[in-house]
Amino acid sequence: MKRLKETITMMLALCLYAACGNNEDIIWDVYPINLEIFITDSEGHDLLDSTFQDNLIKDLTVSYQDETYPVATEREYYKNTRAYMPHFYGLILRQNWNAPRNFGLAFGEFSGEESIDKREITLNLPDGRQAILAYKNSFKWKSNGEPKKNTVFYLDGQELKDDYGKHGIYHFQYSHNQGLKYIPNGTK
């Protein structure tokens, strides 16, 4: 019996040792480019909340590369893979549990592994107004094999300061008189 325990312990140790190889390929999940926006009025009402009487949901579309995308409330989920692959969902209204505002619009996702000079995204607002959002992305692999990525977003040609650290999350205020105005850090 003692010999059997020793044999099993030895085989288990051998299996654990063999499973601890350091020569596996590293698969880097590069964060995708995704624009997320929150829109309020001057009084702080969430203009993307369907329960708010003056919401903008039905009046918003996005034009991108000769296509127009209306606001959708559901998206198709793709099968998980070992490496994260970005999936383009179009313009999605979603409820956020971790954001200062309850509802937001997400447009994307785009591959973060491409260097892009500048691409425009036109947000079509009520009354025929438009806000020109744009992004540029630089990406390269460092000599040690790690990815280096930098994404910058713009509103009407002005660079936006990312509210949550390079993830494309921005807060705006909308009025019929002034159009869309950027609100740094989601403050009024």
Give names to the regions the model predicted.
Residues 21-29, 33-34, 38, 71-188:
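Extracytoplasmic cysteine-anchoring/structural motifs
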Residues 1-8:
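Bacterial N-terminal signal peptides that target proteins for export
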